[in-house]
Amino acid sequence: MPATIKDIAKKVGVNPSTVSRVINGTASISEETRQKIKDAMKELDYHPNSLARSLVNGSTFTIGLVIDAGNSDAFSNAFFIRSVSAIEAVTQQRGFNLLITSDSDKEDNSAVKNLILEKKIDGIILPVSAATEELIDLLLGNHFPFIVLGEPDKVRDGIHWIDMDNKQGAEDAVNYLHRMGYEKTILLVENRITMFERKRIQGFQAAVGLNGKDVAENLIVECGVESNQIGEAIQRALNKYPDIDSIICTNNVVAYETLKFLKKKNIAIPGSIGIITFDNYPLAEYMDPPLTVVDIDTYKLGEEAANTLFSIIQNLGQHRKEVLLSTRIIERESTMKGEKRKK
């Protein structure tokens, strides 16, 4: 015979109403008691009736996460997977389910719209690439809880968003290289379209200026993502500035191709040119040489996004939240040229 709420309450030594409140998330219960109840539920193989919970609470106990269908690498991207893992962990801790959908029909976002209009979810997390004007209007017009993963191009009342502090990350990279004694740095960017790339450009420009260097536009090199494009872009920069001694790459693909190109040209790393890249992707520490990185904690990004969404669900009228999470430099051999020349 299946276990009941009374069985759970008896095992833990609390009232059935306390068990019910933990299951439904309707009251503040101490973490110790909450954990005991969850452990008992697991031990007795108790599964709450989701339909009954929904009827009692007026909640679906489900959070939506939209995936950028236009990004073919989304599910193979380690950073994306870590963010999703964090979001899922938070939703489970809250007793919710996570529903993942895509914006494959970008013309009208019909799948996402249906989730919102038919109240199939209690809140939604959107990547900035999916946060179209039309979809934002729909969410705001229906007073629907949502948060955008990434800084949007336009700031509007009611839009909550969370992102890494890409501008500060780029500033930190330039300042780190300056402390290490590097004098001439270029920034390799895949494009100037996305907000995070533009923020990294802004940070680079700000830090180069503060360090008393000439902030020439051609120190910012747009390189694309293909191997031959990146190699050609680096060669053009070296032809123009033979004294380049360091490169900041704005993502790991660019960094990998930069390593390949410099090795092919027999340019010593870090002996002649130091390299630092955004994103501490899994293989960065195993490259030859291991790459110094601007670490982007995407697990924390997903965790904060989910927790902020639950906060919004509980208090829909709260002031707009704009959250920037800090990056950090992880130093490895790609920027350590002999002895550290400056402390």
What are the roles of these predicted feature ranges?
Residues Y46-S110:
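Amphipathic helical "hinge" segments at domain boundaries
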Residues P127-Q168, V253, D279-L291:
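Flexible loop/hinge segments that line or gate small-molecule binding clefts
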Residues A69-I81, I100-E107, I162-D172, L188-A233, ...:
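Hinge/beta->alpha junction and helix N-cap segments in small-molecule ligand-binding domains
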Residues Q235-K343:
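Flexible loop/turn connectors
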Residues K184, V215-L219, I269-I275:
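Short acidic capping loops at alpha-helix termini that bridge into adjacent secondary structure
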Residues D108-K120, I230-D243:
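Short, well-structured alpha-helical segments in soluble
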Residues M1-F61, M336, K340-K342:
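N-terminal helix-turn-helix DNA-binding module of bacterial transcription factors
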